[in-house]
Every structure is written in structure tokens, then in C-alpha cells.
Amino acid sequence: MTNIGGGSFGTKKIRTERSILPEICIFLGIRITMHYSEHNPPHFHARYGDFSAVVSILDSSILSGFLPNKQLKIVLAWAQINQDELMQNWELMKNRKEPNTIKPIS
């Protein structure tokens, strides 16, 4: 992945082989991203080192992938706290608009 510049809301865009992923948040070595024009259900991607998971925004369940238990608990807690902001970003991205950054867990 390569940083290709900042967005108007302070998000970074990460280029992968398939798409550009706006970075929503980074905390404790965990990178949270979303894809433009993504399929339902509403979800985000969490990456920690070599591990990655797709997490449902609606119920904070793991749709696919794996994170170590400690990081998984942190990501799920963060997702529950920020569910409204995540859904707002999902709607923005469905309309191909730049998402907002979300505060890291403290």
C-alpha cells in the first residue's frame, strides 16, 4: 500500500491493487478503511499488521477475516462507540464523496 495524498477532510487515501481506500482512523497500530462503491451490508475494513477483517457497521460482527483477540475487542468497541459516524461515512462513500475521519479510541 502506498500513501497517495490527503483528502479534503484529512483522510489519507491508500492505493491497493484493486481500489483506493480512504483511511478513516488509525489507533494502536490498527488501520480502519472503507472502499468506494462497496457492497452491502455496510461495513469497514480493519488491518493490523498481516491480519485484516471486514466488520459490519450495523451489528459489529466479523463478516470475514481475522484479527488477534486483543485488537478485535478494541475494534469492536470502537465500532460500537462510532456506529453513527461509520454509517454517515458509508452513505458518503456510496455517493463517492470523501469520508470524514473518526476519532481513535481513547
Feature map (PLM): residue ranges:
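C-terminal structural segments of small proteins and small subunits
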Residues: 74-106
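A cross-family signal for N-terminal binding/gating loops and helix N-caps
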Residues: 1-30, 36, 49-51, 62
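A short, structured beta-strand/loop element
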Residues: 35-69
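Short, functionally important structural connectors and interaction interfaces within domains
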Residues: 19, 47-49, 54, 59, ...
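Intrinsically disordered, low-complexity boundary segments flanking structured domains
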Residues: 19-22, 42-44, 88-89
